[in-house]
Amino acid sequence: MDQPNPEEELRKIAEDATAPVSDADVSRARLVSQFVIFPVAIILVALAIYLGLGLLTVERKTAEDYLNTIRVGGINSRWQAAYELATVLEQEQREGRIGRRFVGELIRVFEASRPDDPRVRRYLAAAMGRMRDPELVGVLIAALDDPDDETRINAMFSLRAQGDPDAVPHLIRIASNDDAGLRKAAVYGLGGLDDPLVPPALEQALHDRAPDVRWNAALQLAAASNNAGLEVLGEMLTPGYLEGLGLNSGQSTRNLPFETIRSVLGLSEQQSPTIRRRNILIEAIKAVGILDARSLAPELQRLREKDPDLRVRQAAIEILNGWEEK
């Protein structure tokens, strides 16, 4: 069988490529352009114009916008606006856009929220911690006796953020409440306030019957370079101690320490037992580092070598390496 001549093949390809287009081919091309390409192009241009105009007209909601929604919005929109309010308050105050009139309006809306969806009041109490203003302190102190426990907890965290020592006696009172969750929140709130009454109150909480209240007290003291809670920190680092307390029993986020403020206030999903254990150990390790408590070096060395959580190991490594460099 004769082999095809390469030159002949190339000639045929060139002839086909340069051959005149038939009328039928031209008609088909025009139909495709008319019924497919042109309509699609028109749709894409219209979509681009719509999106462009949308981006030009959409404005970021301000704190005033959210506050107005809380006043006049529907059932769901009110609590959602209260939730979002906290995300913009801090920045707007930093930029000087929060004036006296807004603070007064925020207080009035909070006071009027008593018969509303409890979430509105909870999130408003939390939002008050995102800005500092003396007028908010009295309102938050009054909210410590709110019938809704979550609102009380949020108010305690916001009082810590305000940094006003007027809240100290009220938080000390709650630190002896029958509810361990409220006691823990009060201890955390006290830890952020500078007042002579705070250290004795935290030292008293080191003997609380609830472990996580004791842990919080030890951490708050350590943050102030007070080593009165060193024994409690040692307990937290003891092998099997956390597991022996039923840490993996699925208890709620509210009843565990060392979450971020948003977690404690119920604004994030419940953490897994593994993450809760990790957070507890890492916070305890950091506290040991703050106190330069080298007597607990063996516990840190064990965590560095044997703990199953790599982040816990890393936290221990950082403290131990820091000690070696000194």
Model-assigned labels for residue ranges:
Residues M1-A24:
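N-terminal intrinsically disordered, acidic low-complexity segments at the extreme N-terminus
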Residues Q34-G54:
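Hydrophobic membrane-insertion alpha-helices, especially the h-region
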Residues L56-I70, Q91-S113, D133-D145, D164-S176, ...:
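Amphipathic alpha-helical scaffolding segments comprising HEAT/armadillo-like alpha-solenoid repeats
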Residues V72-I75, W79-R130, P134, A180, ...:
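Extracytoplasmic/periplasmic/luminal assembly and interaction segments
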Residues G73-G74, R114-D117, P147-D148, D178-D179, ...:
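Short inter-helical turns and helix N-cap capping residues of alpha-solenoid HEAT/ARM repeat scaffolds
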Residues A81, L124, A155, A186, ...:
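Conserved hydrophobic register position within alpha-solenoid helical repeats
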Residues A86-E90, G129, R160, G191, ...:
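Structural signature of alpha-helical solenoid repeat scaffolds
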